């Protein structure tokens, strides 16, 4: 993998990420395609309508169903999903943490029960990489020990040491495999404890293709999250991409870009879309509300998305009220377009050395009203 840093504006960065299946401009927002597709959308929607170059799929879910061997036999995720861009796959540690209810941490991995049928499984650092090799992921995440916040200091330290050990084992295993098209990212843990974050960086070997800031957006305040990012990002190698996992709102993303983060993913645009919340440059709207019943205007004037060029708020209001499946697609296309345009505009502002004024102008308008 080749990462070219093209411009820095204060701490905000613009770059190019060259992967086996695509060239990705950063900062980048990755739509979440947990099961190998973005909910309610297909590969044509992702590629041709949204122009997405990099989406996230989940190792835990693809392993349990349909199984990584099935995907591998069918040519990997790209052929299976007919997506010509790139895939980043999470290690599955977060899902084992959040879905199984009663995981058992061992020194060699995580024992968890399937949320589908209750069967027991063991994820080890090597096992999750083998799964991701079968999926043929462009970017693979190492297995980590995630801690919900708040957490005792002793538990945080345990998590850091275990995560660093697993990351370093993963790196050694990956080197033996000699698969340069499958890139490996480490994950930095430590909750909101800044000394623990520094320890996590110090324990994690150099030589990874990128570094993620994990363990945030799991119960801490926004101020704590931003303080943690501000502390951690400068500790990471300047010549490698930095990925903030699972974050977040438009405000969170712009704040994190300003702190030196390059990559983001979050279910918010699609989940909010399915639940009637749509993003506009002057704030969020709830399309289910009565005032939109006769509103013949698009979600946002001058929006170039597929939905706004064709349909009115009144039509979307009707589809949501009628529980039509088409609603989820049209709403998701709009919200994802909003997010992708946001990071694209942020990138252009960084290249033109005007990121802070861009962010200020965006937030002033965005926070002006929500209805």
From Swiss-Prot:
Q: Which reaction does it catalyse?
A: 7-aminomethyl-7-carbaguanine + guanosine(34) in tRNA = 7-aminomethyl-7-carbaguanosine(34) in tRNA + guanine
Give the source's domain of life in one word: Bacteria
Q: Which GO terms describe its biological process?
A: queuosine biosynthetic process; tRNA-guanine transglycosylation
Q: What is its EC number?
A: 2.4.2.29
The question of whether Nucleus is a record keyword is answered with: no
One GO CC term, this protein = cytosol
Query: Would the keyword NAD turn up in this protein's UniProt record?
Result: no
Enumerate the InterPro entries for this protein: TGT, TGT-like_sf, tRNA_ribo_trans-like
Q: Which UniProt keywords apply?
A: Glycosyltransferase, Metal-binding, Queuosine biosynthesis, Transferase, tRNA processing, Zinc
Textual note on the cofactor: Binds 1 zinc ion per subunit.
Q: What top-tier enzyme class does this entry carry?
A: transferase
| Name of one Pfam family that matches | TGT
- Which sites bind substrate? 90-94, 144, 189, 215
Q: Which residues form the active site?
A: 90, 265
Annotated binding of Zn(2+), by residue:
303, 305, 308, 334
Annotated GO molecular function terms are: metal ion binding; tRNA-guanosine(34) queuine transglycosylase activity
Q: In which pathway does it act?
A: tRNA modification; tRNA-queuosine biosynthesis
UniProt-annotated stretches for the region RNA binding: 246-252, 270-274
Q: Which family does it belong to?
A: Belongs to the queuine tRNA-ribosyltransferase family.
Physiological role: Catalyzes the base-exchange of a guanine (G) residue with the queuine precursor 7-aminomethyl-7-deazaguanine (PreQ1) at position 34 (anticodon wobble position) in tRNAs with GU(N) anticodons (tRNA-Asp, -Asn, -His and -Tyr). Catalysis occurs through a double-displacement mechanism. The nucleophile active site attacks the C1' of nucleotide 34 to detach the guanine base from the RNA, forming a covalent enzyme-RNA intermediate. The proton acceptor active site deprotonates the incoming PreQ1, allowing a nucleophilic attack on the C1' of the ribose to form the product.
Which HAMAP family does the record cross-reference, listed alphabetically? Q_tRNA_Tgt
Q: How does it assemble?
A: Homodimer. Within each dimer, one monomer is responsible for RNA recognition and catalysis, while the other monomer binds to the replacement base PreQ1.
Q: Which PANTHER family match?
A: QUEUINE TRNA-RIBOSYLTRANSFERASE CATALYTIC SUBUNIT 1
Protein name (record): Queuine tRNA-ribosyltransferase
